Structure formats: structure tokens, C-alpha cells
Amino acid sequence: MLQIKNLYAYYGKIEALSGVTCHVRTGEIVTLIGANGAGKTTLLNSLCGLVRSRGNISFDGASIMHLAPEAVVACGISQAPEGRQIFAPLTVEENLELGAYLRFRQRQQQEIAVDLKKIYDLFPRLWERRLQAAGALSGGEQQMLAIGRALMAKPRLLLLDEPSLGLAPLMVDIIMDTVVRLRREGVTILMVEQNARTALGIADRGYVLETGRIILSGPAADLLNDRQVTRAYLGKDYREFTEGR
């Protein structure tokens, strides 16, 4: 589905990604893990046309390099960004409708109404708060809203940037259960997560990004048991803890 080959990305003269090559197959959950500043968000933003880059990015066999962000969305890719970036003064429902802005232009109002109901079925709390200002939501509710807004574009590939950031453990479980459910319903997912243990626990495969380069990749279960990953991202006692259970 998604092929990234020899990708470089820049902020001014600063090189943020250095020859990244990776892929996502249809129906997978793939996670990118790494420390702050490793380039994870830059990679997602490069896919969305938000960062100057060179190399090759193809989606379903067609190049999406240098497409405008709205054209990337039209191809079937949408993102729930880091920090959620909701429109705080607007209502929950208005935020969700903004996720379907391209479809409004195509006069798909009836389909949009159906999909809005699906989002409320996925996140009942959003239905309860639909007429309230989005800025009044809790952190977990705002994350639900960010994911719901991205889904309103009807993506085939959903990009999630730090979906567990700042959330209580119970809410993290709810969000990750939702990610698994979305995959079952046919949405392919590429997820950036600093919480490596949580991300690898639900992913099929993973990539470890360090200072703009992929340094390790493989099945999620293998990465969970890799000594380098264990010490750098899971804590030095994680292996002993799991082996002692």
C-alpha cells in the first residue's frame, strides 16, 4: 500500500530524515518508535505534504511526492496529529464535519451524515458532547475527536501521531482498543508512539527511528524481545519483568 524509499526531509538547511526506507502493507498496524527528536513526526508530515522532502513516496503504486496536503487526503490518507490540534472554539460536531471538508465540496452530505453516526458509535462520549465546545473536552476525549475527525475523510491509511500522549492509562487502553478495532474494520494504520511497549503490543511490525534513520525493523513481537529496544525504549528491567511473569 505505502512505499517510502530513500526519503530525506528538511527544516530549512537542517536534515531531519536521512534516507528512510520503509513500507506498510494493506491491513497492517505498523508502528514507528523512537526518542523525542528522532524524526517520527517529520516522517508522517512528509507523507502528508507538510514538510519539504526528497526521495520517493508511493501510495497504491502512484507517487504522492510533492502533492498538496488536500490532495494527499483525497488519495485516501489522513492524520490525527500530535497534540490533537482540534479547533477549540468549535463544537465537537463542527470539528468532525471539518474532517469531511473535501467530501462537502463533492456534495456527499448524505454519506457524511452516515459516517458521522459511525463516529458516534465508535466514540459514544463524542455523541454526548457533540454540541459542546471542543476545548472543554478532557485530553482523552480530545484524542477521540482527533481520530474521529481524521476518519471523517474516509481514509484507507490512517496516520496516528502519539495517540497516547498525556493520557491516563485507562484512556490509553481505550484508544489502543479502538486502533485494533479500526484495523478489523479495514483501515490500515501507521502509528507513531513514544510508548513503545503499548505500540508494539498491538502492532504487526515496527520500525525504530533514531536521529532521522531507521536503525531496526521487524515483527513487533521480535522488537519487544530485542535487547537494544528493551534497554533503549522499554526500560532495562522490562525483559526480566516479563520473563518472571
Region locations from a protein language model:
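Glycine-rich phosphate-binding loops of nucleotide-dependent enzymes
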Residues: 1-245
